[in-house]
């Protein structure tokens, strides 16, 4: 293992009458402290995962945009979700990859909070979009006759815009408040990304109210959306079990099963990480949990949807021009 070195660089001196303060103007993202050969291995592994994630989600978004037969609300929601995943994984992974090859592993003060903002905003938009997709499934299966009149193109556009706008506004105030707190050193963030837990630990002045505000918002967005999704699929399951046709039941189970698998992948690590102030979590476990929902989940989402959905597989074959590829 690499020895932990206390970095004292990145401090900005601010002089006042009778006093002198040093404030942080950059942070050190410590990441994984390990030998250089292991750093190279992790860089290669995460680069491959990142490339596969971009390719998989990009392929789904592209084929759903190209195939007009799939221009329905259900598939358009999925296309937006894949597009969102590309930006979500790109908010943290490129900097993470650069740090694997860097000795200093620094990130500017503004860069850290921008990463924090986009990572949380895109994650919130993802949670909201999964909730909207559950609502769409509920309408399609439980209210099939009313579905075309309710889920119109106009409503679809409104819901997608609402997910993006609310996602980018949800954590804006707490992130601004945290950024205004004094950080006077040390400036080491013992994490792979700029995360509120390690940032609160570096704050010179304790801010329990801001902490409570931040974790309350996290709990609301995670549990609120999760409970809505579970409630929707409870009603969907009840409706599916009452279907007289076995073919209809199989198709409904296939579609809903894919969505529930993605929901489980997204929400399980989030619930562990952000519904409490992080008590009882070792820094190593926090890093692994973050990597799981920041990299592994976006990687498997396109696989789950494409392998379970015949329409998407057919569209992929059509666009790629070869049935042997998939």
Curated annotation (Swiss-Prot):
Glycans are attached at residues 13, 18, 106. Its main location: membrane. Disulfide bonds join 112-194. Residues 1-44, 94-112, 180-216, 281-287 are extracellular. It is found in: Cell membrane. GO terms for cellular component: plasma membrane. Keywords: Cell membrane, Disulfide bond, G-protein coupled receptor, Glycoprotein, Membrane, Olfaction, Receptor, Sensory transduction, Transducer, Transmembrane, Transmembrane helix. One of its GO terms (molecular function) is G protein-coupled receptor activity. InterPro entries: GPCR_Rhodpsn, GPCR_Rhodpsn_7TM, Olfact_rcpt, Olfactory_GPCR1. It is a multi-pass membrane protein. Coiled coil: none annotated. Residues 66-72, 134-158, 238-259, 309-326 are cytoplasmic. Pfam families: 7tm_4. The chain crosses the membrane at residues 45-65, 73-93, 113-133, 159-179, 217-237, 260-280, 288-308. Belongs to the G-protein coupled receptor 1 family. Odorant receptor. PANTHER family: G-PROTEIN COUPLED RECEPTOR (PTHR24242), OLFACTORY RECEPTOR 11H1-RELATED (PTHR24242:SF201). This is Olfactory receptor 11H2. The gene is OR11H2.
């Amino acid at each position: 293992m690499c020895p932990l070195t206390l970095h004292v660089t990145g401090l900005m001196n601010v002089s006042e009458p009778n006093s002198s303060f040093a404030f942080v103007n950059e942070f050190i993202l410590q990441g994984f402290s390990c030998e250089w050969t292991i750093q190279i291995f992790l860089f290669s592994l995460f680069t491959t995962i990142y490339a596969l994630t971009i390719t998989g989600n990009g392929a789904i978004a592209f084929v759903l945009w190209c195939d007009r037969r799939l221009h329905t609300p259900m598939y358009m929601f999925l296309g937006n979700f894949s597009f969102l995943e590309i930006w979500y994984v790109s908010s943290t992974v490129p900097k993470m990859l650069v740090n694997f090859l860097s000795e200093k592993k620094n990130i500017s003060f503004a860069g850290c909070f921008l990463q924090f903002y986009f990572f949380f905003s895109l994650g919130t938009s993802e949670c909201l979009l999964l909730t909207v997709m559950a609502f769409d499934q509920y309408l399609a299966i439980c209210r099939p006759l009313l579905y075309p009149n309710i889920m119109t193109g106009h409503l679809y556009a409104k819901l997608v815009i609402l997910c993006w706008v609310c996602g980018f506004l949800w954590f804006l105030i707490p992130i601004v408040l945290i950024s205004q707190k004094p950080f006077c050193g040390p400036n080491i963030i013992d994490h792979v990304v700029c995360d509120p837990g390690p940032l609160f630990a570096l704050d010179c002045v304790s801010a329990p109210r801001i902490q409570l505000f931040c974790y309350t918002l996290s709990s609301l967005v995670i549990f609120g959306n999760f409970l809505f999704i579970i409630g929707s699929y409870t009603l969907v399951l009840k409706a599916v079990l009452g279907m007289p046709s076995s073919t209809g039941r199989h198709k409904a189970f296939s579609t809903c099963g894919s969505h529930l698998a993605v929901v489980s992948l997204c929400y399980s690590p989030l619930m562990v990480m952000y519904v409490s102030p992080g008590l009882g979590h070792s820094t190593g476990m926090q890093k692994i949990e973050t990597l799981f929902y920041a990299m592994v989940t976006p990687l498997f989402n396109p696989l789950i949807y494409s392998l379970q959905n015949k329409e998407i597989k057919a569209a992929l074959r059509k666009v790629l021009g070869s049935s042997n590829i998939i």
